[in-house]
């Protein structure tokens, strides 16, 4: 879909293979945290370490020049001149706000990012896409960081056994 949109609006489309970094930084960490009994949020790690760090680095390394890096996150970034720092703010659409997923971004990252969707409701974006003939106007929302089988990712094998309560009583 992204390739089609880029062609449709007349901008270059590039692909960078970040799969090794994603495997090491996001998936391995997710697996370690999950199997240690914690509930990781891989999107936060992916945003701060892959999307806004590895990806811009690879683009610049490939000779692409850009002042700002734009994504489709529903959040806003404002510059506070008094404090001389960038502030991450919620998007206006409280149901689709994604500022939480970006909270680990550093000042240098925030300085180089544009989040054009943060000032719109999702329905407005879909309407704009439809009016401009973009095929993604009715595309379902993406929700997951991994499109495979979680058991395979976590290397969890089902085991036969009794179902027990917290006191150790066999329930079935």
Predicted stretch roles:
Residues 1-103, 124:
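ATP-dependent adenylation/nucleotidyltransferase module used to activate substrates
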Residues 70-77, 81-172:
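AMP-forming adenylation/ATP pyrophosphatase catalytic core
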């Amino acid at each position: 879909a992204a390739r089609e949109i880029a062609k449709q609006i007349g901008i270059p489309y590039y692909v960078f293979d970040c799969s090794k970094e994603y495997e090491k930084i996001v998936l391995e960490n997710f697996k370690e945290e999950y199997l240690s009994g914690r509930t990781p949020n891989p999107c936060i790690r992916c945003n701060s370490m892959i999307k806004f760090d590895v990806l811009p680095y690879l683009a610049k390394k490939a000779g692409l020049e850009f002042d700002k890096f734009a994504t489709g996150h529903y959040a806003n970034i404002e510059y506070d001149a008094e404090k001389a720092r960038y502030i991450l703010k919620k998007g206006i659409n409280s149901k689709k706000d994604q500022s939480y997923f970006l909270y680990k971004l550093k000042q240098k990252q925030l300085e180089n990012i544009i989040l054009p969707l943060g000032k719109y409701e999702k329905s407005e974006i879909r309407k704009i896409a439809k009016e401009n003939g973009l095929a993604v106007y009715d595309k379902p929302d993406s929700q997951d960081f991994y499109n495979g089988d979680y058991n395979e990712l976590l290397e969890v094998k089902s085991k036969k056994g009794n179902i027990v309560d917290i006191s150790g009583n066999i329930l079935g």
